[in-house]
């Protein structure tokens, strides 16, 4: 299979207590899979873009659960199996004001942290239309910093469009470490996606969102810069023009994975040859739909996205 979009990164087991319960007292935990790069692949796949996910997993029921879940959504896993490695996980306790949502990682020494290019199916990157990874991946280990750079270089040399989400996680590394690592990768990146707050915190840039996008495009020669702005929507700078997209109103059930849904939809439209402004709209609509379902994955359909874009309501569909 030649995938149009290939993503690379870690997928974890997500464990969460029932809504309104605390981890320290819950008698049961909901079991799902989650990872920025696989979330992106799922969103793209469900919108008609052939997608593959590249990684390393333990050869265990937990590792196989990950690949089974991805195949359910049409994503083809290309995995290096490791008999002795462990599966990363995270626990999430959903907050309600004034109590914030709390995330606890248990991902140290996960299989993916030792992944090297010579262990991976690099040829699928060379054959893809686009390759995507995020700042989470190089944060996990020094080995992954090197592997991420080598895969981006492989994609660049093959003429594959490269996309990178800054995706800063303060529980994984400091802003200065993130800046040093990510800026070393930027020369190999065509499409940069970043939350406005991450640009300010990690890259230490100032100004409004259009100014940030223009500065990044100028400083690092990105073909496209996408800035996500939470409730203020998103914008993209491409070809010297800035396009803005407001959010779609949504009744939020679970916000985790919203940004990944946006990116997956955005890339799926770029790969399909759609203009940047159309890709932005698809990203925003898919992100809104993702917020209405539990879990990290955007379990959506193209018809649902089109309905949001047309301004359809949320009544009963009979």
Swiss-Prot record:
<feature type="active site" description="Proton acceptor">
    <location>
        <position position="260"/>
    </location>
</feature>
<feature type="binding site">
    <location>
        <begin position="228"/>
        <end position="233"/>
    </location>
    <ligand>
        <name>ATP</name>
    </ligand>
</feature>
<dbReference type="GO" id="GO:0008671">
    <property type="term" value="F:2-dehydro-3-deoxygalactonokinase activity"/>
</dbReference>
<feature type="binding site">
    <location>
        <begin position="35"/>
        <end position="39"/>
    </location>
    <ligand>
        <name>substrate</name>
    </ligand>
</feature>
<feature type="binding site">
    <location>
        <position position="90"/>
    </location>
    <ligand>
        <name>substrate</name>
    </ligand>
</feature>
<feature type="binding site">
    <location>
        <begin position="257"/>
        <end position="260"/>
    </location>
    <ligand>
        <name>ATP</name>
    </ligand>
</feature>
<feature type="binding site">
    <location>
        <position position="296"/>
    </location>
    <ligand>
        <name>substrate</name>
    </ligand>
</feature>
<keyword id="KW-0067">ATP-binding</keyword>
<keyword id="KW-0418">Kinase</keyword>
<dbReference type="Pfam" id="PF00294">
    <property type="entry name" value="PfkB"/>
</dbReference>
<keyword id="KW-0547">Nucleotide-binding</keyword>
<feature type="binding site">
    <location>
        <begin position="167"/>
        <end position="169"/>
    </location>
    <ligand>
        <name>ATP</name>
    </ligand>
</feature>
<dbReference type="InterPro" id="IPR011611">
    <property type="entry name" value="PfkB_dom"/>
</dbReference>
<keyword id="KW-0119">Carbohydrate metabolism</keyword>
<keyword id="KW-0808">Transferase</keyword>
<dbReference type="InterPro" id="IPR054871">
    <property type="entry name" value="KDG_KDGal_kin_Halo"/>
</dbReference>
<dbReference type="InterPro" id="IPR029056">
    <property type="entry name" value="Ribokinase-like"/>
</dbReference>
<feature type="binding site">
    <location>
        <position position="260"/>
    </location>
    <ligand>
        <name>substrate</name>
    </ligand>
</feature>
<comment type="subunit">
    <text>Homohexamer.</text>
</comment>
<dbReference type="GO" id="GO:0005524">
    <property type="term" value="F:ATP binding"/>
</dbReference>
<feature type="binding site">
    <location>
        <position position="169"/>
    </location>
    <ligand>
        <name>substrate</name>
    </ligand>
</feature>
<dbReference type="InterPro" id="IPR052700">
    <property type="entry name" value="Carb_kinase_PfkB-like"/>
</dbReference>
<keyword id="KW-0614">Plasmid</keyword>
<comment type="function">
    <text>Involved in galactose catabolism. Catalyzes the phosphorylation of 2-keto-3-deoxygalactonate (KDGal) to produce 2-keto-3-deoxy-6-phosphogalactonate (KDPGal). Can also phosphorylate 2-keto-3-deoxygluconate (KDG) to 2-keto-3-deoxy-6-phosphogluconate (KDPG), but the catalytic efficiency for KDGal is 50-fold higher than for KDG.</text>
</comment>
<protein>
    <recommendedName>
        <fullName>2-dehydro-3-deoxygalactonokinase</fullName>
        <ecNumber>2.7.1.58</ecNumber>
    </recommendedName>
</protein>
<feature type="binding site">
    <location>
        <begin position="105"/>
        <end position="107"/>
    </location>
    <ligand>
        <name>substrate</name>
    </ligand>
</feature>
<comment type="similarity">
    <text>Belongs to the carbohydrate kinase PfkB family.</text>
</comment>
């Amino acid at each position: 299979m030649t995938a149009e979009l290939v993503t690379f990164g870690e997928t974890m087991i997500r464990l969460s207590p029932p809504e309104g319960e605390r981890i320290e007292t819950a008698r049961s935990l909901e079991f799902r899979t989650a990872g920025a790069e696989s979330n992106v692949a799922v969103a793209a796949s469900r919108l008609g873009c052939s997608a593959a996910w590249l990684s390393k997993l333990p050869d265990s029921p937990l590792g196989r659960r990950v690949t089974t879940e991805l195949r359910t959504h049409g994503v083809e896993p290309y995995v290096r199996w490791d008999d002795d490695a462990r599966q990363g996980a995270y626990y999430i306790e959903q907050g309600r004001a004034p109590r914030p949502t709390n995330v606890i990682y248990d991902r140290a020494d996960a299989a993916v942290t030792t992944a090297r290019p010579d262990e991976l199916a690099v040829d699928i990157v060379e054959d893809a239309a686009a390759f995507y990874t995020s700042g989470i991946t190089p944060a996990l280990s020094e080995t992954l910093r090197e592997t991420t750079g080598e895969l981006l270089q492989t994609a660049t040399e093959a003429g594959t469009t490269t996309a990178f989400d800054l995706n800063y996680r303060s529980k994984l590394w400091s802003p200065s470490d993130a800046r040093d690592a990510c800026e070393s990768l930027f020369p190999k990146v065509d499409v940069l996606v970043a939350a406005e707050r991450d640009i300010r915190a990690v890259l230490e840039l100032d100004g409004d969102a259009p100014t940030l996008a223009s500065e990044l495009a100028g400083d690092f020669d990105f073909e496209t810069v996408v800035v996500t702005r939470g409730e203020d929507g998103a914008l993209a700078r491409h070809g010297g023009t800035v396009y803005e997209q407001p959010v779609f109103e949504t009744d939020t059930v679970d916000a985790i994975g919203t940004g990944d849904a946006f990116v997956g939809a955005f890339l799926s439209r770029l790969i399909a040859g759609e203009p940047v402004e159309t890709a932005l709209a698809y990203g925003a609509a898919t992100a809104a739909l993702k917020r209405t379902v539990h879990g990290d994955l955007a379990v959506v359909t193209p018809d649902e996205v089109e309905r949001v874009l047309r301004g359809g309501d949320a009544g009963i569909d009979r």
